[in-house]
Amino acid sequence: MCPVTTFLVLVLTLLVLVYVFLTWNFNYWRKRGIKTAPTWPFVGSFPSIFTRKRNIAYDIDDIYEKYKDTDNMVGVFTTRVPQLLVMCPEYIHKIYATDFRSFHNNEWRNFVNKKTDMILGNNPFVLTGDEWKERRSEIMPALSPNRVKAVYPVSQSVCKKFVEYIRRQQQMATSEGLDAMDLSLCYTTEVVSDCGLGVSAQSFTDTPTPLLKMIKRVFNTSFEFIFYSVVTNLWQKVRKFYSVPFFNKETEVFFLDIIRRCITLRLEKPEQQRDDFLNYMLQLQEKKGLHTDNILINTMTFILDGFETTALVLAHIMLMLGRNPEEQDKVRKEIGSADLTFDQMSELPHLDACIYETLRLFSPQVAARKLVTEPFEFANKNGRTVHLKPGDVVTIPVKALHHDPQYYEDPLTFKPERFLESNGGGMKSYRDRGVYLAFGDGPRHCPGMRFALTQLKAALVEILRNFEIKVNPKTRSDNQIDDTFFMATLKGGIYLDFKDL
């Protein structure tokens, strides 16, 4: 055999072996009697992972629309990892709540190594079993209604500064308006650092501290982590000897240093104690011997969980109120002109409804993935039962459920009234039916939900009292979400104009 022929045979053999490696388990769900969505080598069921031409959420939407009327679930693959896309709201509520023990863990734990990623690896979202229970039990009391109420005056003070910052920025703005995400990040950075650590990030000045700059960088996922995620989906055993942190070392060192300095200051100057998150952690250390590392980790969890998602939601609420001036006027009338107490802030049903409706249209988490932790069974519409075993992955199509006309009339339209309790039970009724998952559900629901909602409402109250929000023409008019960002945000950015009232 000539050298050229030998080379071609070797190449062909290699290609065949690679193809077999990538596709050998594509019958994983068919063998169990479950339909499988169209699947391709390398990309699995979600080609947008590689093409980057649209957000992966739209791949999930297409599969959901194709199978939702005939099946309760359908098999899908992320590269070559089998997952069960569950479309039945009753089953979804079981996964989150009633049968939680069988779906206890989030799939993210498969990609995070605690040894190499101290920040995310110790986050309750990633932790499992007793570690998750212990960490959550440390954090939840610090976010109780009484403690959120205790820092509410701090939030009000930050909001008034925020209004003045918006006013100054608007005076200097070009015809393209103000970047709503930049504004929102300035606000959440300031309010989280003040309520959590008792320090100002100087976000509303011309010389902000490095904290604001670092926070704007922190969720820019590195190419190395994306590559690692793809490789581990192709060959899961690689996790045993190769791991890449979601947050880089510079980020970790920066935040740990800030928190250590804040702890030292509190211990050296007890007269500066405040009833905030860090103070609660120090009290827990004194009462129960909480290790200093746990204080650092818990405080980092509070900070990092508190700014990016809340900023995204605030930016999109302002967008939706700008697009719907009649709803903006309703909220403005509801809040009135007098300062609101914490309890009064909790009783603004139309503002709540606007927040919930925005989260329905732009839920930051477009899909959720859970690991099966105990054997479980689901019945399909054809009567066939699928037996799930520990380690299997179930995917919940959050965005698709939120946009399904079967559950939400005219789903692409901003209709806050659907979440008013006077119209059928409010947000909780949708959540209990398994079709509203903006905050998750069950024991692993978002621990910072109460704090985040308070900060959102406090900001919106002050903004709407002082400004009329208008959407700048630079902002697109549809709800197309960004192609690559892993949380749902409007493609092209949100640009707003603020007119003094």
UniProtKB/Swiss-Prot annotation:
The keyword Hydrolase does not apply. Heme binds at residue 446. GO terms for molecular function: heme binding; iron ion binding; monooxygenase activity; oxidoreductase activity, acting on paired donors, with incorporation or reduction of molecular oxygen. Its cofactor is heme. It is a peripheral membrane protein. Keywords: Endoplasmic reticulum, Heme, Iron, Membrane, Metal-binding, Microsome, Monooxygenase, Oxidoreductase. InterPro entries: Cyt_P450, Cyt_P450_CS, Cyt_P450_E_grp-IV, Cyt_P450_sf, Insect_CytP450_Detox. It is found in: Endoplasmic reticulum membrane; Microsome membrane. The keyword Amino-acid biosynthesis does not apply. Belongs to the cytochrome P450 family. PANTHER family: CYTOCHROME P450, CYTOCHROME P450 28A5-RELATED. May be involved in the metabolism of insect hormones and in the breakdown of synthetic insecticides. This is Probable cytochrome P450 28d2. It comes from Drosophila melanogaster. The lineage of its organism: Eukaryota, Metazoa, Ecdysozoa, Arthropoda, Hexapoda.
